[in-house]
Regions:
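Amphipathic alpha-helical packing segments from all-alpha helical-bundle domains
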Residues: 107-146, 176, 180
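Helical hydrophobic small-molecule/effector-binding pocket
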Residues: 79-124
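Alpha-helical structural segments
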Residues: 15-22, 40, 57-80, 84, ...
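Residues in the helix-turn-helix
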Residues: 15, 33, 47
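Hydrophobic alpha-helical segments that form the core
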Residues: 135-157, 161-177
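Basic, helix-initiating cap at the start of DNA-binding domains
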Residues: 1-27, 36, 40
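Short hydrophobic/aromatic patch on the recognition helix
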Residues: 42-52
């Protein structure tokens, strides 16, 4: 995946990502070709392969950009505790529900887990010190990401309109009650 700073290349990268997501709204991911993505973005296959190695790479890029947006939203808080983290997470995904639904419909949820797991260390840096120490356990990190993402997927799949704060509180009550700082 391209990671340089060239504005033209970055723009092409975004156009290709937007093209794939737009195509996924009408067609299954598996049946979309690189040629179709390029035609829809009005770019060449050569440009595609300069930016990405595969369609999966395009999805990773899209999710990675979302992770960056999420991290930026967390940096606005003075302190990030577990409830703040969960609330911000659900608020972010409420805005990204259409994308998550497309990923779920195409069995690409594992890419959400993969990319948010990669972003978690930076997200944890925004957490309060006591939580940071607690969250350094790799099993607990997996639990948090898995729990939050599966709640997101269930919420979007059901489309039940559950309130963001209600979901964050539900997660926090289940998770926080057994943390070291509460004993």
């Amino acid at each position: 995946m391209y990671s340089g700073k060239n504005p033209s290349a970055l723009r092409s990268q975004q156009w290709l990502a937007d093209s794939l997501i737009a195509l996924m709204a009408d067609k299954a991911y598996q049946s979309i070709s690189v040629k179709e993505i390029c035609q829809n973005a009005d770019l060449t296959r050569q440009t595609f392969y300069q930016m990405f190695s595969s369609k999966e790479d395009v999805i990773r890029y899209t999710i990675m950009k979302g992770c960056e947006t999420f991290k930026a939203s967390l940096s606005l808080y003075e302190q990030v505790d577990m409830e703040t983290l969960a609330t911000a997470f659900f608020c972010f995904f409420r805005e990204e529900a259409a994308l998550v639904k497309l990923l779920a419909e195409n069995h690409l949820e594992y890419l959400l887990t993969e990319q948010f797991s990669l972003a978690l260390p930076e997200i944890m840096d925004l957490c309060t010190e006591r939580k940071k120490a607690f969250l350094s356990n790799p099993y607990l990190k997996s639990f948090i990401i898995g729990g939050l993402l599966n709640m997101i997927l269930e919420w979007i799949k059901n489309g039940d309109g559950a309130d963001v704060e209600e979901l964050a509180l539900l997660f926090t009550e289940q998770f926080v009650k057994d943390t070291p700082e509460n004993h």
